[in-house]
């Protein structure tokens, strides 16, 4: 049977799409890691470490000792170990609260394996090549490049946190920071007249208050990010990752019947992807 010539372009987009999806699924750590590594030293006061993180809008610093990478200190350490622990930022040293040892990975590792390491070891990852520190990997780095694949097609509802902590916009930031530190959570929903109006995060605490030594007696409503960015409950892990990356957020409240149904974080998405 004689057939005519194929029409140009038929199947070509799908081949490209398939190849791109396959490339995304097998990306390496070196493709997505943050190469600008900020450091501090073990004997640095936490007040100075906080200023660096706040000014740079970053969530962690690699801790150096004797010119070698030793550990990591994070914005969560500021909340849960310093503020919630009643410690003083000026007198507390980085080595008093840092996480040790440093979790090290290779730049040639595929990103899903990096996600599994992050969840298993419970922390940010330091990338080493030939013994040299070359970058860091955070949950935000991973969700920015999360592939559209079977493992990311699951619904977010299974992985979200249903118990969402809310506070009134009139609560002082000091009180809110105490709640976040004791509960070991990175954000609270801020309500106005009993309705969700914004979100206050550990990054807000660092970059808007601690770095400027601003009074924590300020009502949290004045510092919350508003309007609240949300998504519908039931979306896929991949869809949630795309929204977070596009909106430059790490926490996404999920709505159902015009009510907050839960909240999903970048780390939750990484945990789902790592399965």
Residue positions per predicted region:
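Tandem CBS (Cystathionine beta-synthase) repeat/Bateman regulatory domains
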Residues: 1-275
